[in-house]
Design a protein with these regions (language model features):
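N-terminal Lys/Arg-rich, disordered targeting/topogenic segments
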Residues: 2-24
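Short active-site loop/helix that positions an aromatic residue
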Residues: 339-356, 508-522
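Compact, glycine/acidic-enriched structural inserts
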Residues: 359-443, 505
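Second-shell loop/turn segments in exported
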Residues: 90-93, 130-131, 139-153, 489, ...
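N-terminal Sec-pathway targeting helices
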Residues: 18-38
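Ordered core of a single globular domain
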Residues: 214-237, 241, 249-250, 265, ...
């Protein structure tokens, strides 16, 4: 036995010290162990943070605001089918499900459409907010909501109630992982309750995405100034001719138009009241008859387009429908691939909405694609009809060069007061910004907000529209001490009825109903194709399409001369329509709608029709061999041959 004992000299045995290597090993072990513990804890925290935002997709939930039980059945891909006894419960549930899956996307979108992105992400977004506030999408949406019929407003309110029911049960990162990230730089941010105007405003964003030729018009004006090489002069005929070469006309003799011949609609025309129970009584629809990309050019416009989800350069939408006479099934086949901007998550949200009993009180049994944040189904089919969209590419935007003198502008030889309003842009982590927005009778002044519109205002005359015979609009420029500015005239800046059309399309039962719904689909203007279970196919040009006085909007127009104003819009009953054409098919691919002898000006900036020509070729080639099938439609959609380089 080894033992020690105390002696008078107070001595003890002293253990030997570990070697340096052993001590380093112990320290390394402790460091590694600490790192592992921290990593495990971090992984647990991240997993917990992510998973707590996952929605409940099975079992039952008790929600205030429902009048009866609602069933939400998701398939293996998470696509929901919502079944309810009433329209109120149906759209309440759609709002709840959209919020479950996409609320951060919805919240972000409404900040974009309201010009409030800086509230979420700080000063870097203030310039984009200023541009979007100037356009005033949110104010237009609020005006549309105020003008809605009681039934349609009820759908939007029920949807908002459903979104808010989800918000009531969660907050912060429980709603979406992104809120945990935002909280790091903006800890005070809290999502607001959802409102109907939040939904309607997204249609304005889609109209911007599909706005047409504003970039082309801007580019031509800048090119005219560059090519002429001198300030203050009207573009020479040589410059005008060069621009015509750079932007050639549509090749009508080479590529197809959508409606070669306007065909008669079914006997009886279009009865607006027959469209569905969801339509207001005062739609004003009359019986119809058979009459008749450059890259983004400004940093702010580009930023707004990116936030919305721009279509990108060289991308276009396609749709076509073939009659049963060309199909193996003996029934029509409809294909549609609308090319909106790529985003994650997708701009589309697939859903099916079903009333337990389909009747006048609850008329919906529709499936297809919606926008998260918007009630209803935008593109899809019900039990009687199917429909699809492509961008109409008509010219619905014009730039006007204005002569500004102080707080007034020149108009037909007289000074008229500018309209002004002030808005406050709130900035996360920064000071509020006061924004003064000025407008003329044409629309908001955008020069000073975008580089290119400012460049046009600095040297506008070379790119200005003028009557080549008389020089009207430019021979007398008023106000020698005035300054130039650029304003925007755009159909989407006036209240419309597209928010109602979504429901009218979903409940349409035949071509008359479809056209009545199309008459409400004013902005964004879209090619609408149609098929029904009775074997009919059809097409309708809808939209608020301007009738111009002098000029055609190909270049900026002199705002001081009212002869260049829009004088109205093409009556719906005179817009192109096709019903069961003899060809047995209808193809739309952003190409020209009708021949150039149509009674009204539509655009000079069509897609040149090579995609449409290729689709027509494939349909005719395959139909000549055997009746078409759904697989044939899919293969045509996936076709990658580009004819512009071959013809």
């Amino acid at each position: 036995v080894f033992s020690t004992m105390m002696t008078d000299s107070q001595t003890t045995d002293v253990p030997s010290r570990p070697s340096i290597g052993v001590r380093i090993g112990r320290i390394a072990f402790l460091v590694v162990a600490g790192i592992v513990v921290i990593a495990v804890a971090a992984a647990f925290f991240v997993t917990w943070t992510i998973q707590r935002s996952f929605p409940q997709t099975s079992g039952s939930l008790e929600l205030d605001g429902l009048s009866a039980d609602v069933t939400v059945q998701r398939d293996s891909q998470g696509i929901p089918t919502i079944t309810a006894d009433t329209t109120g419960d149906l759209f309440f549930a759609e709002g709840f499900v959209h919020a479950q899956d996409r609320f951060f996307e919805m919240d972000f979108r409404r900040h974009v459409t309201a010009g409030r992105v800086a509230e979420m992400f700080g000063e870097s977004q203030a310039g984009t907010d200023a541009f979007l506030r100037t356009l005033g999408w949110r104010k237009v949406a609020e005006a549309e909501v105020a003008a809605m019929d009681e039934t349609t407003l009820g759908y939007y309110e029920a949807y908002a109630d459903g979104v808010n029911a989800y918000l009531a049960s969660r907050s912060g990162a429980e709603l979406s992982l992104e809120y945990a990230v935002i909280g790091m730089q903006n800890p005070d941010y809290q999502p607001e309750p959802w409102e109907p105007a939040d939904s309607v405003a997204w249609l304005k964003a889609m109209a911007w995405d599909l706005r047409g030729n504003i970039e082309d018009e801007t580019e031509r004006a800048l090119l005219a100034a560059e090519l002429d090489g001198g300030e203050g002069a009207i573009a020479t005929p040589e410059t005008q001719a060069l621009l015509e070469k750079l932007y050639p006309a549509y090749p009508f003799d080479e590529n197809p138009v959508i409606v070669p011949k306007i065909t008669a609609v079914p006997e009886g025309g279009t009865d607006a009241d027959a469209a569905s129970a969801t339509l207001p009584d005062d739609t004003g629809i009359q019986d119809a008859s058979a009459t008749i990309e450059w890259e983004e050019t400004s940093s702010v416009i580009e930023a707004a387009s990116i936030l919305v989800g721009d279509v990108g350069e060289g991308i276009g939408s396609n749709s076509w429908v073939v009659s049963g006479s060309l199909a193996e099934s003996g029934m029509p086949l409809l294909a549609n691939d609308p090319h909106l901007g790529a985003s994650l998550p997708s701009v589309w949200y697939q859903v099916q909405l079903k009333c337990s009993t389909v009747d006048d009180e609850c008329p919906f049994d529709v499936g297809g694609f919606s926008f998260s944040g918007l009630p209803g189904v935008v593109i899809g089919h019900n039990q009687s009809i199917a429909w699809g969209f492509t961008n109409l590419t008509t010219d619905v935007t014009d730039l006007y060069v204005e002569r500004i003198q102080g707080d007034q502008y020149w108009r037909d030889g007289a000074l008229v007061p500018l309209e002004e309003r002030t808005e406050t842009i709130k900035v996360a982590g920064g000071d509020d910004i006061e924004l003064t927005i000025r407008s003329t009778g044409h629309g908001p002044i955008i020069s000073g907000l975008t580089d290119d519109s400012t460049a046009i205002a600095d040297d506008p005359l070379p790119g200005l529209t003028a009557d080549p015979a008389t020089g009207a609009g430019i021979s007398e420029v008023p106000g020698e001490d005035a300054e130039y500015a650029v304003s925007l005239r755009w159909t989407a800046l006036d209240p419309g009825t597209a928010a109602t059309a979504v429901f009218a399309l979903s409940t349409a039962q035949d071509f008359d109903d479809f056209r009545a719904a199309a008459s409400l689909f004013d902005v964004p203007a879209q090619n609408l194709i149609y098929a029904d279970t009775s074997g009919n196919i059809g097409y309708q040009t809808p939209g608020r399409l301007p009738i111009r006085g002098a000029g055609d909007g190909w270049m900026p127009q002199p705002g001081w001369d009212s002869s260049y104003d829009w004088t109205g819009f093409i009556p719906f009953e005179e817009l192109p329509v096709s019903y069961n054409p003899s060809s047995g098919y209808i193809v739309t691919a952003n190409n020209a709608i009708v021949a150039d002898d149509y009674a009204y000006f539509l655009s000079r900036d069509w897609d040149y029709g090579y995609r449409a020509a290729r689709i027509v070729h494939l349909i005719e080639r395959r139909a000549a061999v055997a009746p078409l099938t759904a697989e044939d439609m899919r293969e045509i959609q996936l076709d990658s041959e580009m004819w512009i380089g071959k013809r």
